[in-house]
Amino acid sequence: MSRSVLITGGNRGIGLAIARHLAEAGDRVAVTYRSGEPPEGLLAVRCDITDTDQVDAAFKEVEEQHGPVEVLVANAGITKDQLLMRMSEDDFTTVVDTNLTGAFRVTKRASRGMLRAKKGRVVFISSAVALRGESGQANYAASKAGLVGFARSMARELGSRGITFNVVAPGLTETSMSQALSDEQLENLKTQIPLGRLARPEEIAATVAFLASEQAAYITGAVVPVDGGAGMGH
């Protein structure tokens, strides 16, 4: 059955891989993007998830073209890495506002239609860093760890309405972010991963697709690591 799906930050990397995977399975997929080029073959809506009005406008456009959102993947996120003593308050709050509060904004808006339908799937894209920590990423780790508490609270709050909330925690993945690392940095990072390689975006997408499926109807409040064993789920 074709569903209305919305993926935030779905114009590149992991978000785009998820969008392509679900679209190929027959879903009506829309993605939000803040910068860059919109992907071809998908309904792309420009939206800054730190702006509540833009979030509402994006949902209205998706609802008009695809119907109420039945599957939400909160993927949009940013990094502003810096050691604590050099990290400004803006560096911290901007990352939290995008990665955590942004997820709150889109979840709250999506819940309207899901509550009426008495069903829905919400998947948050966190990070292995949220579970194991990382020097220089206190802001990012805090924002991504916050998604776990948020998802589990929502699972308890709205579970009786047939809406599931789960978290996927990817490890280092083959995206533009990892491509910015030097060969030496990559090799050093690989030594910390039991499987000895980076994740492919398609592997993250397959996990999200499962959690959004009927086969996962009895899974909620879960955190699924897709990190090659780097964090072991913690």
Residue ranges and their predicted role:
Residues 127:
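Residue(s) in the substrate-gating loop at a strand-loop-helix junction
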Residues 11-12:
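Conserved glycine-rich cofactor-binding loop
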Residues 107, 143, 151:
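Active-site helix of classical SDR
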Residues 112, 156-160, 217:
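Alpha-helical segment proximal to the catalytic Tyr-Lys
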Residues 132, 209, 220-234:
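Short C-terminal tail/terminal secondary-structure segment
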Residues 193-204, 215:
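A conserved structural motif in NAD(P)-dependent oxidoreductases
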Residues 83-84, 88-96, 178, 189:
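Substrate-binding pocket helix/loop in short-chain dehydrogenase/reductase
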